Amino acid sequence: MESGEYANEILVSDAGSNEKLDAQSQPEEAELKKRKRVLFLCTGNSARSQMAEAVVNNDLWDQWIAVSAGTKPTGYVHPYALAALEEAGIFHQGESKSVEVFKGQNFDLIVTVCDQARETCPLWLGPEKRIHIGFEDPAAVQGTEEEKMAAFRNTLKLIRATIPPVLKEFEGE
């Protein structure tokens, strides 16, 4: 089954979330196929791009399919990113992956979320619209465990406040 298809009223999303939908709230299959695709790109694909992917797949699942990647992936999703998402009620089973995984795929929008990824965004990604929405790296914060976790919570809050309104601007295009 492909991501975004229904099986027994369970929505399978790219973020790995399963959301039980009642029959009245289920959009038509044709509507789901009209969803736009967005790629969130950062360097390590361990925090910011992962959180952006999860937020979009949770909050805008009926309009967008989000994926994320890194130009130099770390190979893991930061535990504080997963903890912040869980606290916010967002289920995410992402994995840190290279942008190379998406070679040959088409996206309606590519969003770089860190300055380094913006500078090194591969040209082979194609002529899709590209925008940059930079967020400070929460993994760079030094301090106590609570201070570090607070940085991830704050970044998630900023992502959730910033990304959905920007994507809504691109829905009609």
Where do the language-model regions lie?
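Conserved small-residue
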Residues: 45, 85, 110-111, 159
